Amino acid sequence: MSGHSKWATTKHKKAVIDARRGKSFAKLIKNIEVAARTGGGDPTGNPTLYDAIQKAKKTSVPNDNIERARKRGAGEEAGGADWQTIMYEGYGPNGVAVLIECLTDNRNRAAGEVRTAMTRNGGNLADPGSVSYLFARKGVVTLEKNGQSEDDVLMAVLDAGAEEVTDLGETFEIVSEPQDLVAVRSALQEAGIDYDSAEADFRASVEVPLDVDGARKIFKLVDALEDSDDVQNVYTNIDLSDEVLAALED
C-alpha cells in the first residue's frame, strides 16, 4: 500500500473524529447552503447539493440543520450569508505545497486568519498560480468495503469514467475527472453499492516525501488552518511512507 494511500486513510479517520466532535458540522452546513444557492434547492436536480446533503447525513449532522441550510441557500428561509470561495496558496515547512480553500462572508478576516496560521507554523503565503499548478482537480468517491472486492467496485464504475480504484485498508477510493463524478456516484447507486462521500478534490501531481519530524510540522500547520471557521479544505503534496505513518500512530 502506498504512502499516499495510507495518508488518505489517516485523513479519512481524522475527518470522522472531527465530525464526532462537531468540528466539521458548520463547514458541512455551509457547503449545503452554497450548493443550494448556486444550483437550486432541489437535490434531485442539483447533484452538488445532493452530495453535500449525503455527506452531512453520513457524518451525523441533524436533519433539521441540513434542511434549514438548504432553505437558506434556496431563499426559502431568511438568514443566509453571502459566502464567497477564495483559494490561498503557500508553502509549509520543508517546501511542502499548500492549497487552502476558504468559504467566507468576510474576505479580510479569512485572509488574516490564514496568514496568521501559516506564519506561526513555519509557512508563508505565495502569489496566485505559484502553487496551484502542482495540483489537479479530481472527482473523489469514498466508500466502506462492506465485503466488496476492489474488482466488484471497479466493474461497477469503470464505464462511468472512473480512472482508478484504490484500496485504503478499511475503505475504497474512486478517482475520476470532476465532470464524471455524478456518473460514477450514480453507477454505484445502480449497482446497489453504498458510498460515504462524493466530492471534487485536489490531488498533487508531484509529492514531497517527509520524515516523522516533517510530517508532525505539516500536521500542526494543517490543524491550525482548519481551526479557522473560514477554511473549508486544506490540500498538501506530502508523501508519507508506511514507516513514517507507523511512527506517527505510536
UniProtKB/Swiss-Prot annotation:
Pfam families per the UniProt record, alphabetical: TACO1_YebC_N, Transcrip_reg
Subcellular location: Cytoplasm
Disulfide bonds: none
Swiss-Prot/TrEMBL GO biological process terms: regulation of DNA-templated transcription
The UniProt record lists the keyword Lipoprotein: no
InterPro entries assigned to the protein according to its UniProt record, in alphabetical order: Integrase-like_N, TACO1_YebC-like_2nd/3rd_dom, TACO1_YebC_N, Transcrip_reg_TACO1-like, Transcrip_reg_TACO1-like_dom3, YebC-like
Keyword field: Cytoplasm, DNA-binding, Transcription, Transcription regulation
Keyword DNA-binding on entry: yes
A Gene Ontology term for the protein's cellular component: cytosol
Gene Ontology molecular function terms on file: DNA binding
Entry's family note: Belongs to the TACO1 family.
Protein name: Probable transcriptional regulatory protein RER_29220
The species this protein was found in: Rhodococcus erythropolis (strain PR4 / NBRC 100887)
Lineage of producing organism: Bacteria, Bacillati, Actinomycetota, Actinomycetes, Mycobacteriales
